[in-house]
A protein has these predicted regions:
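PRPP-associated nucleotide enzymes
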Residues: 1-217
Length: 217
C-alpha cells in the first residue's frame, strides 16, 4: 500500500488542517464544513494526477487544440455522516463521478466498549473501476477495513484511493495488516501518534461528524 502525506509539504493545505484542528475556529460548523470541503478539493487535484489520460483534439472558436483529457470516471465512496463534506470536495472536481455511500457507526456496549456496524450501502458496480473512499478520520482503522470489505461485495475495483485527513499511527498499521484489497493508496493530511482508549486520535480534532452537523444522542 502506497502512503502519500500531503501535510509534509508546505502549502495552503496545511492552513486548512490548522483551522479544522483549532478548538476556537472549529466551533463555526459552516466554516468547519467548508474547510473539510476545501481539503477534499486539494486531495482530488492530487489524486487526479494518478488517473489515465489521452490526448484529444478540441475545437476552439479559432482552431484546434490538442488537450490531455482524463479518460477515467472514478467512483466516489464515503462513510456517513462525517465524510459528507470531504466527499463534496472530491465531487466538486470529479463532477461526473458515480457515488457510493456507506453507513458505519459505533454501537456502544456497557463499559465503554463498542463495535463498528455497517447497516446500509448504496453503490454502483465497482468491477474494473477506480474508487476513491473517504473518511475524515482514520483512528483504529476498523471502520475503513469494514468499508473496504463492503465495497468489494459490489465488484473488484482496479484501484482504491483511501482519503483520510487525520490518521493515527496505529490505524495506518492496522490498515496495512488487514486491508482486504492490496492495490490501494492511502492519502492523508496528518499522522498523529496517540489514540485514547475510546479510539479518538490525539491531538486529532475531536468528533468530525459532530463538528460538521451537530451532536448526536
Amino acid at each position: 500500500m502506497e502512503i502519500i502525506n500531503l501535510g509534509q509539504q508546505n502549502s495552503i493545505f496545511n492552513h486548512f488542517i490548522r483551522e479544522i484542528r483549532d478548538v476556537n475556529i472549529q466551533k463555526d460548523s459552516m466554516r468547519f464544513r467548508r474547510n473539510i470541503e476545501r481539503i477534499g478539493e486539494i486531495f482530488a487535484y492530487e489524486i487526479s494526477k494518478k488517473m489515465e489520460y489521452e490526448n484529444k483534439d478540441i475545437t476552439t472558436p479559432l482552431g484546434i487544440s490538442v488537450e490531455s483529457l482524463m479518460t477515467e470516471k472514478p467512483v466516489l465512496a464515503t462513510i456517513l455522516r462525517a465524510g459528507l463534506p470531504l466527499h463534496q470536495g472530491l465531487l466538486n472536481y470529479f463532477d461526473r463521478s458515480d457515488n457510493c455511500f456507506i453507513s458505519a457507526f459505533r454501537k456502544h456496549k456497557k463499559g465503554g466498549n463498542f463495535e463498528i456496524k455497517i447497516e446500509y450501502m448504496s453503490s454502483p458496480s465497482l468491477d474494473g473501476k477506480t474508487v476513491v473512499l473517504c473518511d475524515p478520520m482514520l483512528a483504529s482503522g476498523n471502520s475503513m477495513v469494514l468499508a473496504m470489505k463492503a465495497l468489494l461485495s459490489k465488484g473488484k475495483p482496479k484501484h482504491i484511493h483511501i482519503v483520510a485527513i487525520i490518521t493515527s499511527t496505529e490505524g495506518i498499521q492496522y490498515l496495512k495488516e488487514n486491508t482486504p484489497f492490496r492495490n490501494c493508496t492511502l492519502w492523508l493530511g496528518a499522522q498523529d501518534a496517540e489514540m485514547t482508549s475510546q479510539s479518538y486520535i490525539v491531538p486529532g480534532l475531536g468528533d468530525a461528524g459532530d463538528l460538521a452537523y451537530g451532536q448526536k444522542i
